[in-house]
Structures are given as structure tokens and as C-alpha cells.
């Protein structure tokens, strides 16, 4: 049973600009990652959601981290039914966009023929090979939007993920209550288990259509918990930065309640990743360090 604790970024602007967590404000990208990896043994790569990485960049991450380090890589927005900036999409994929969508500034998965969707997944998977070959790739993490509801076509899309990312540990987070409303929860978990997809447990504000309850469950050998905090005022707010949306510092009491639950979940998996996504200033790294102390 392995429990890893880390944060959802090591390059958040407010962490670098507004805190003294890193030894120096002007550290190089290499030194910053090396320092992070000296404090935690897992990180979620958030930048890959906005722009798919090159294999060369992934190779640098691989070289700059210890042998036992893990990176959970967030899937490119296009692959999770979010809009993707046109300039972030691979040229080979853009070439297959039908004429009626060719001039759009944002590209959606629904604009693409099936062959282009397959190509996009293949390009993303290819870029991650250095991490995977080194045994440092944790999960390929797909965070779906709140409009990705529990309906037949979306369930079919989930069924396609393992085939499109062969050999990788694929983890799924939902942002709509329909996946767990009524008797849907057990069905959702059974589907993920049948397809070999890891369920991402969440701690987040409740009471919204985009809220998913804090169900702790494992559907593969990899268990994942993401801590989003409880800032209800900003959870669905528009026009704000991720740092503001997840601006929440967990209290000692909250983390003390979570520690035994993390341990209990970890007993059902080979490896568990607890990721703090409260990426405002040093909130995430502070809470991650606190949880590590509680788990020791």
C-alpha cells in the first residue's frame, strides 16, 4: 500500500510570486521542479490541459525528477469535451476539422470526425512516452466538464478511453451530479471498473449541479482523491482564475478527519494519490505537507 501526497501544480503563479515556499523567486524551471520533487513524491501536471506537451518537454520532466517520483498528467482539454484553443490543437488534427468549423477560435471534440479524435488521443499519448517508459507516469487524468452529463453517448465515450490510451492508467473525474444521483452512483462505478478506469474521488463544494458527493471508492489499483476545498462562492463563478476559484485552506481539524479516510481508501488499492487542488498561494503545499504528517 503506497500513499502519495502532492499538489495539482508546481508552477502556479501565486505560489511563485506571492510566497516564499520556493527558496528563490527567480529559480529556473529545472530547479523549481527539482525542489518540488524534494518535498513531495507526486504532482499533477495542469499545464497539459491547456496545451499538449511535446515529447521533449516530457523528457525533461522525466530527467529532472527522482526515480520514485510520479506525475499525474491532466488530459488536454479537447479530449474531455472542453473547448480547446485553436492554436493549441495539433496541425494534423486541425486539418481534419470540417469546413463549417474551420474558422472557429475554439475547437470542440464534437467538431471532429472519429478518425481525428483517435489521432488526437494518439498524439497526446505519444508525448507521454518518456514518463511512461521511466515508470514515472501516474494516471492520465480526464476531468470532464459539468455539461458532460450521465447520458448514453457520454457513457459510450467513457467506454472508448482505455482503448484510446492503451497501457496507461486512466483516471476520470466528473463535474455533474447526475453521475451519482439516485441509483446512478453504483452503476457509474461498475462501468469504470469494467473498463479499467480509475475513479477520481473529490472533496468539493456541495449543492450545485456540478457537485459530486465525496464518495470514496476504488475501481482500479490506482486510487485518486482531489481536494478542491469548499469555496462555494467561487465554485461556479465565471471570469476568475483557478487560484481564486479554489482559494480555500483546509483546517487542521478537516485534515485530521480526512487522514483515516485516506488510509482506509488506500487499503483497497495498490497506490493512492491525494492531490490538493486548492492552488492559491501556498495553500496546496501547506495542506499537502500537513496531510503527510498526519499519515506518518
Feature names for model-found ranges:
Residues 1-296:
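Residues lining hydrophobic/aromatic ligand-binding pockets adjacent to catalytic sites
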Amino acid at each position: 500500500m503506497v500513499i502519495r501526497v502532492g499538489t495539482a501544480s508546481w508552477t502556479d503563479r501565486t505560489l511563485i510570486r506571492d510566497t516564499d515556499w520556493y527558496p528563490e523567486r527567480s529559480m529556473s524551471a529545472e530547479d523549481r521542479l527539482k525542489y518540488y520533487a524534494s518535498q513531495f513524491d507526486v504532482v499533477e501536471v495542469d499545464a497539459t490541459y491547456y496545451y499538449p506537451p511535446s515529447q521533449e518537454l516530457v523528457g525533461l520532466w522525466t530527467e529532472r525528477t527522482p526515480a520514485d517520483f510520479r506525475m499525474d498528467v491532466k488530459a488536454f482539454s479537447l479530449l474531455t469535451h472542453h473547448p480547446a484553443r485553436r492554436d493549441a490543437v495539433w496541425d494534423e488534427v486541425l486539418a481534419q476539422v470540417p469546413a463549417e468549423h474551420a474558422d472557429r477560435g475554439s475547437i470542440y471534440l464534437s467538431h471532429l470526425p472519429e478518425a481525428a479524435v483517435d489521432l488526437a488521443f494518439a498524439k497526446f499519448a505519444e508525448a507521454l512516452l518518456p514518463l511512461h517508459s521511466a515508470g514515472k507516469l501516474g494516471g492520465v487524468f480526464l476531468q470532464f466538464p459539468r455539461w458532460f452529463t450521465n447520458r448514453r453517448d457520454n457513457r459510450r465515450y467513457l467506454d472508448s478511453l482505455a482503448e484510446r490510451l492503451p497501457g496507461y492508467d486512466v483516471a476520470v473525474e466528473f463535474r455533474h451530479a447526475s453521475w451519482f444521483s439516485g441509483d446512478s452512483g453504483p452503476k457509474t462505478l461498475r462501468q469504470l471498473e469494467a473498463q479499467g478506469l480509475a475513479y477520481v474521488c473529490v472533496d468539493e463544494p456541495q449543492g450545485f449541479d456540478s457537485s459530486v458527493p465525496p464518495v470514496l471508492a476504488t475501481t482500479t489499483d490506482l486510487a485518486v482523491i482531489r481536494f478542491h476545498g469548499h469555496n462555494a462562492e467561487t465554485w461556479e463563478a465565471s471570469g476568475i482564475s483557478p487560484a481564486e476559484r479554489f482559494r480555500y485552506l483546509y483546517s487542521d481539524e478537516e485534515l485530521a478527519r480526512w487522514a483515516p479516510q485516506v488510509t482506509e481508501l488506500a487499503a483497497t488499492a495498490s497506490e493512492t494519490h491525494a492531490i490538493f487542488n486548492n492552488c492559491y498561494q501556498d495553500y496546496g503545499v501547506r495542506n499537502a505537507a500537513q496531510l503527510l504528517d498526519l499519515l506518518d
